[in-house]
Every structure is written in C-alpha cells, then in structure tokens.
C-alpha cells in the first residue's frame, strides 16, 4: 500500500485553466492535465526563480518531493509543446489557495492560522506548549484530529 500524500500548500491561482494550440482544425487535440501542485512547483521554481529548498518549504513538502513534482510538470509541459497537445490545470491534491498556514498544538489540540509570510510559532497561544505541527489542510481537518502531515513517528 503506498504512503499517503502529504498536504501541499498552493498560493497562486492560475489565471487560465486551459490552453490549446493555436491554428488547430478538426477534432480537439489530446489533453494533458497539469495538477495544481505541479503548476505551483513550476510557478515557484521557474517563474519566481526560487531554489528548490525554499520552494519546497513554501509548498510544505521535502526538497526531494518538490524535485519530483517539478520534474513531472516540466515533462508534461515539454510534451504539450513538442506534440501540440492541449493543456489543462486542475486537481492534484493541493490544499487550495492558502494565504495563511494552519497550526495545531498536539498537547491541547488548539488550532490557529498565521499569515504565510510570518515565521513558524514557537509555542501554542492557548497552553504555551511547544509540541506543534503545521497542517497544510484546513483548520476543520486539523480540528477533527486527523493530522494531514504528522512529522513525528510513534515509538514501537
């Protein structure tokens, strides 16, 4: 059974969700789907010019995972350009537009949001506990007790 995907933060909405080659006649060309997290990876790496480590941190994934996402996205874009295919953007497991980050205290289960551009909190504002995690999903997911990206491993 494959490991579940970690939640990914997507901060930029694509201005268009579909592209088709100009000058095509006849039946519609085959379509390649670029997921929202692949779009975000290309936006951060190629449009904003961020290094993979910083871009991975913004998306809430490891650098290695970011490298795989951006590599897959670039391969799809190259295929679209070389073969003259249509491109659509959507789906892919991102958490949607997230101008803020959600945090949860593992001690008291208190949840709160902080702006994305601020540093991670040092302690819980409710109980002053330091056992925190950042959840890329909505606060509803965090409040339900389901951790989208638990960073600690349970001792066996």
UniProtKB/Swiss-Prot annotation:
Pfam families according to UniProt:
DUF134
Q: Which InterPro entries match?
A: RNA_pol_sigma_r3/r4-like, UPF0251, WH-like_DNA-bd_sf
Gene3D superfamilies found in the cross-reference section: Winged helix-like DNA-binding domain superfamily/Winged helix DNA-binding domain
Stretches of the chain forming a coiled coil according to its record: none
Please indicate which superkingdom the organism of origin belongs to. Answer: Bacteria
Family statement: Belongs to the UPF0251 family.
Q: What's the name of the protein?
A: UPF0251 protein Sfum_2819
